[in-house]
Amino acid sequence: MVDLATRAAPEAGAASPPDHIADAIRRIGPRFDPAVRSEFIRLYADLLRGRPQPATRIARDVAYGPDARHLMDLHVPLHSPAKSLPVLAYFHGGGYVEGHKNLAGDLIYGCLAEYFVQSGLIVANVTYRLAPQAPWPEGARDVGRAARWLDDHVAEFGGDPRRLVLMGHSAGGTHVAACALHAGLRDAKRPPVAGLVLVSGTFDVEDTEQPPNIAAYYGTDRSSYARKSTIRNLATGPYPPMLIATAEFDPQRFRDHADALARRLTELGAAPERLRIPGHNHVSEIYHVGTSDESLGPHVAAFCKKVAGS
């Protein structure tokens, strides 16, 4: 395991939130609930509205499957690149039961996508099905479905499908990890992805409380949780390169799960990178990407460049 906890962000600008957001993060601490999410959507939407308009094109609501939520936005450079670019597919959070690829118009997540286009990537900003209509393992299957669509079609947008990195936050990170690492879900016929970026996911559901959203996705039978937990059912290697990140003010369970997954993968011969993002909470760690705060973005961009080229 490569611990990035004390490293400065590569080529970083300001690596902390603005004062009024930092004050809110410290005031709330590791607590996370819908009210916290709503407060930070408002705070970051206000911040992102003033950003410069990036030089990108967006193909909106591209269908990658038959369901109404099988949609992605493809963010590409305004001017066609001279060569194919690596691809980052991003899967949002939402506690399994809510969430969308665009919040506050297209400010949150859309700005994240725009940021990584400026870093030399084609970005797919992906929406997937939700529980209870789509219980385990459908979130992971939607990640796989989106990846296969990109295999077949991203070259039409200037992307190289052989250089695909999957990134997910919270529930999205849970689904990405399950798709790529769970022995019962990994698609052995598909070429391995270039890398995974897992931000504050749940990797051991058996070691998790059972609030309504967990029960909606994983079911109410706790005896089934062990076989549904990625960390307890890791596929055999080799494993793709991984960046596993959490925030300083994440709820403790997310930090514990990230540490446990990184340790287990290291025991199995992998070398995941473990990043702890100072001064952020469970949602600000993602919502800030695209602002002047570069606590996470340069780390992800550098990881993608290392594993997928430029």
Summary of predicted features, one role per range:
Residues 2-310:
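Alpha/beta-hydrolase superfamily serine-hydrolase fold, recognizing
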